[in-house]
Amino acid sequence: MGKCVGVADTTFARVDMGSVAEEVLRRRLPGYRIVRHTVPGIKDLPGAAKRILSMGCEGVITLGWVGRREADKLSYLAASVGLIMVEVLTGKIVIDVTVHEDEAEAPEELAAIAVDRARKHAENLAALIREGPEALVKHAGMGLRQGYPDAGPIK
């Protein structure tokens, strides 16, 4: 199959974060095939990630959207545990990107958070694949944020 990387996203999301991630990965990982798998909701992301990784991909970015209700938050918890299990059991990179609908009131602000978070985490995935596990060491403790301005380090 050659080198590949995965993007898993949902139809529940209100922003097409998958396309944002795809664009970054195409630019940062030339020569890699991008496998995209869109599923209905966040509880479906662990299965999608596992299927993508089973195809031989080196890593996957999952892009979920959590609604405002308690049931949505519990669904996210289940999905998060599932994604952790996929990462541990496969030994491959799984970057879990999630936007919680209660992070902002204005739809425009939510969209900006989603795009920024998807872009920055896709950059992280590309760096980890290109440079290996030490790729992000230079950023440790720097207070970097995805979806918001960086907080900066505490001196």
From Swiss-Prot:
This enzyme's EC code(s): 2.5.1.9
Keyword Protein biosynthesis (UniProt): no
This protein's name: Riboflavin synthase
Pathway annotation from the record: Cofactor biosynthesis; riboflavin biosynthesis; riboflavin from 2-hydroxy-3-oxobutyl phosphate and 5-amino-6-(D-ribitylamino)uracil: step 2/2
Domain of life: Archaea
Gene name for this UniProt entry: ribC
Higher taxonomy: Archaea, Thermoproteota, Thermoprotei, Desulfurococcales, Desulfurococcaceae
CDD domains for this protein: Riboflavin_synthase_archaeal
GO aspect biological process, one term: riboflavin biosynthetic process
Entry's Gene Ontology molecular function annotations: riboflavin synthase activity
Stored Pfam families: DMRL_synthase
Keywords of the record: Riboflavin biosynthesis, Transferase
Keyword Magnesium: no
